[in-house]
Amino acid sequence: MFKVGDILTYAFQYSARHPHFVRVVRVTPKSIAVEKLENKVVSHDGYGQNGYVVPNLENPGKLIEGTFRVQESKYFGEYCKISGCYATLWNGTPEEFYTD
């Protein structure tokens, strides 16, 4: 089960990829509450269209209203759906973003 302080990542993706990060702020037996964190660009192509981001842990996040049910998948383990995307535990490496 996720724990308070865990960082999760999810991305909107079709012809572009826009990663997002959230931090777990409350845990119940079957759900979590999260706050949305700002992205911090760590590298880009010079135009800001392609690159890598990490969560900005220096600024406080913004609480997302409601709770999210935690589920289990044999493919990628524990997750919850946020804004229609699968949020999973962030592995600590920068996430790629790009636009077409």
Residue ranges and their predicted role:
Residues 1-21, 31-100:
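Mixed-charge, low-complexity intrinsically disordered regions
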